[in-house]
């Protein structure tokens, strides 16, 4: 990353932290609790935390340097382009009728139009966004939608519309064009195939296929070169999430737009992700068959939740350890997030698949 890009990144992070602090300060969470919350003894003093050390990021996981304005834009194939701020990704397709935009991440924000302007000027094409496709309803991938005005045709799954109407967020206008299973977007001589294959990260997360550009966009499933963050990218349907890469690989494509991290993905990235999650699942099954719950529940007696926590922590740590050892240096942040991912896979194995459940005699 260039120094100027680092400054841009730091500025955006400072803005985020400042905004978060303001929101937290304005919220009266304590008011809903009887008697409120006691102030810490030294409310005015904040100690400097001791931060953990983590393994270096493998060079293969890193993307290209950002420009002075904090973004990178490049061609995927022909007139399909991708944009990243190093953490989030978007894509756009230039056509003779205007620009088709796919997701509008809040952190990229106004840089989306700057990236489009840059490409349009270089190629002598229109920079007007005519259509915006939502991958799903989450604000981190759609929070800059309102920047493109009211005349843009917004397209999404029918559940995306329901959820956005529920959320009533003015930054994310609900799509006016919706579909249940399949929709082909035709505009300016181009075609894009949208499909819903069931719940995964969210109930409305869709597959965006560019058949004439050898590209698939599937957001919040595989982070190319990186492990998933908390709880499989904060996914709502774990079995659906785990199955999604197999569906992705059933499409013909060469380039993968994941919605996150700073580089494009490949089919090998998706295969590696599958192996990582499969290893976690196998290790969880071994841990469930190996770790004895008895000492945890005996030790804590009537405090059942303490027994549950310490037992599941022990199973999770047992299952995560060999996976962390195998993938550190292969997938970025393996040592950061594998334990939290292991817990959610473990619980899905127990609760969704019934592994380890015992019926009282």
Language-model region placement:
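N-terminal secretory signal peptides
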Residues: 1-12, 22-26, 39
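C-terminal regulatory/interaction regions
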Residues: 17, 296-361
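Zn-dependent metallo-beta-lactamase
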Residues: 20-97
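Conserved beta-strand hairpin/beta-sheet module of binuclear metal-dependent hydrolase folds
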Residues: 71-118, 207-210, 215-220
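Active-site neighborhood of phospho(di)ester-bond hydrolases with catalytic His/Asp-centered motifs
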Residues: 102-104, 130-137, 155-157, 217-219, ...
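Active-site HxH/HxHxD metal-binding segment of metal-dependent hydrolases
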Residues: 117-186
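Metallo-beta-lactamase
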Residues: 158-204, 211-212, 242-245, 252
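Divalent-metal (often Zn2+) His-rich catalytic cores of metallo-beta-lactamase-fold enzymes
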Residues: 242-306
